[in-house]
């Protein structure tokens, strides 16, 4: 008999389940940032603090804290970690792990056997080793841990994801005047999905600003969200001049 780690399965709702889980994650992250006024990212200041060995936000220290699942990391620490990543040698805004598609295919092949849950965990972890801020792989990794009843580990990884969401949302309001700042295109869609919207169109407005149109929601007037990708494009132009 095959042991299933996901006993309730409706093939028509597999994507809706994921969206519901992500909505819960957003709620947690919004609570985390509720008392924090959004403010613009000062990349010059970020560079100064993360490159100073005597600063509490020295990048190697931040990365060690992050990788050790340190739940004492503040939102300010996460802001310097996330935006400071753009100054690291291995930063590639368009990076995609070779394992990411493997994980996605396994995830949507429901219900899962125990071995398949193990594989989702394994390949999601390998994907995150390649692309540390891949929120989709974080979701899959957390899913596999919960399915295997590793709730403590799942909670630690959930904290990471919640803080990253809060970090992006603390950078603005998603408006033309105060866009959210992201360091990879994927994160634009992650935020849109976390808010419970479905993207319908993507526009490049110039000056490093992008606009994602969303499907209308009943009772909501939101038509879309603005994102600042200027730092991402600045680095891409230097590292990939032929693009």
Regions of interest found by a model, annotated:
Residues 134-136, 163-177:
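Boundary/linker segments of alpha-helical solenoid repeat arrays
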Residues 151-167:
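TPR/TPR-like (Sel1-like) alpha-helical repeat modules
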Residues 34-117, 175-243:
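N-terminal alpha-helical interaction modules that lie
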